[in-house]
Design a protein with these regions (language model features):
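Blade-level signature of beta-propeller repeat domains, shared across WD40, Kelch, NHL, RCC1
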Residues: 129-155
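Structural recognition of the beta-propeller blade-terminating site
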Residues: 44, 85-88, 133-134
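A short beta-strand motif characteristic of beta-propeller blades
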Residues: 2-8, 49-57, 90-100, 137-143
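Repeated scaffold domains used in trafficking and secretory/extracellular systems
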Residues: 11-19, 59-69, 101-109, 145-155
Length: 155
């Protein structure tokens, strides 16, 4: 095995998804000490080039990138749940799901029923609460889970 090509995308990549056009989306948390802003980056895997690089405002810490079933809308955590249709060129300033006083720690998209799963770690000691929402952010229900639940796998 050998490296055939590379591309600098910034520091602290925290999520990766592939869209309906086979483009690679990477969420980079950035790096405060070196003044690198967090970014959402779209890479063309054929040309190995960055097609979109969208910076987040200072002080933001986006993470937990996932994509919907039709692979045309990304979701991520950033003190709330945000969506990003891949056809857009700018980030939304408002979350579809507000975090409030909760401690969102995990995010997933269930392609079987098109629902968003968000884990509230509460205080890192109690059992987490999993909240389930529609893609537009309408609350459906919540269920209890283990301590600091952070990932979701759907068959």
């Amino acid at each position: 095995n050998s490296i055939t090509d590379s591309l600098f995308i910034g520091k602290n990549a925290s999520g990766i998804s592939i869209d309906k056009n086979s483009k690679i989306w990477i969420l980079s948390k950035g790096d405060v000490p070196s003044s690198q802003a967090p970014k959402l980056i779209c890479i063309n895997p054929i040309t190995v080039s960055i097609e979109k690089s969208i910076s987040f405002a200072g002080g933001q810490t986006p993470w937990r990138l996932c994509i919907n079933k039709t692979k045309d809308t990304l979701f991520y955590l950033n003190n709330g749940v945000y969506n990003f249709p891949i056809s857009q060129s700018s980030l939304s300033s408002s979350p579809i799901i507000s975090q409030g006083s909760k401690l969102y720690y995990g995010l997933g998209y269930n392609p079987n029923d098109n629902t968003i799963y968000v884990s509230d770690a509460i205080d890192y000691v109690q059992k987490s609460k999993i909240e389930i929402y529609t893609p537009d952010g309408t609350f459906i229900k919540s269920v209890n889970a283990g301590i600091i639940s952070n990932s979701f796998i759907f068959d």
